[in-house]
Amino acid sequence: MNIRETPADEKIKISKFNFSCDDVDDTIPKPLPQILNFFMLVCGRPGSGKTSLILNLVCKRGKMFNKKFDKVFVFSPSLMTMNDEPFGELPEEQVHTDLTIDNFQTAIDSIANTGEKILFILDDVVNDMKKSMAIQTLLSKALMNRRHLAGAGGSTSFIITTQVYNKIPAPIRKTASHIILYHTRNKKEIETIYDELIVLPKEDFYEILKYCFDKRHNFIYIDINKSYDKMFHKCFNQLEFNSQNDTGL
C-alpha cells in the first residue's frame, strides 16, 4: 500500500504542556517508576513473595517509595494482621480490611484538591471488586484519572495485588502502567497477558518467562511505558535480547 501525506497549515502547532502530576522524583531508583502516578499490578500465588515485595517497596526505611507519599490508604484483609504491623501508624480512616463502594468513595473524596501525593494499596481484594459493578466502575474511573485525583500539585498511585492476572476485571487491569508477575503455570493467565500486552513472537515471550522464573521467588517486571525491547526485567534487572515486534508498530 502506498501512503502519502500532505503537510497541514503551518499555523497548526502542537506543543507540550507540563503537569505537576508528572514531576520526576529521581531519588527513586530505576527501573521503578519515578513519576508518582503509576498503577502497579502485582500477580502471584500465595507464598510467591508479593506481600514481601510491597513491604520492601513501601515500608523499608529510606528505600524506594518509603516517605515519598503524603498519605497511604490500605485496603487489605491481611496486611494489618502481620506481627510487626508495618502500617500500624496510619490513621484509622486510611486502613480498611475490605473494599466497598463507601470506603473507597470516601477516600477518593478526601484527597480531592489536596495537592498531595497519594498511594492506594489494594491487597487481595479482588473478590470485593467482583461483588459489585459499582466498585469496578468507580475504581476503573479512578485509575484512568489517577494523575488528577488529588488536584494541582498532587498525584495518585496504585499498587493492586492479585493471585491471578485475569481475575482482575479487564477494564481495570488494562489501565496498569507496570506489571509484576511471579512464576505461574496458568496457561490462560499467560495467554491473557500475551494477548493484551506483548508484541513479541509468542515463543520469544515464553523464553523470557522461562529465563525470569529460574528461582522460586523471582518475577518478571514489565514496564508498559517502554518499547517492546526495553520493557522486560528479571526482578528489576533490565533484559537485553534479540527479537522482533510482531505488529510492526
Placement of each model-derived feature along the sequence:
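P-loop NTPase motor core of the ASCE superfamily
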Residues: 2-3, 24, 28-47, 53, ...
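An amphipathic, basic-hydrophobic helix/alpha-beta surface used to engage anionic
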Residues: 72
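N-terminal pre-Walker A segment at the start of P-loop NTPase domains
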Residues: 1-29
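Conserved P-loop NTPase motor cores
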Residues: 40-62, 67, 77-81, 96-203
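Alpha-helix initiation/capping motif
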Residues: 80-83, 100, 223, 237
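Short, aromatic/basic amphipathic alpha-helical patches
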Residues: 83-93
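Residue-level signal for well-ordered alpha-helical segments
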Residues: 19, 31-34, 156-158
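Short, flexible N-terminal segments of the mature chain
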Residues: 91, 96-100, 240-244
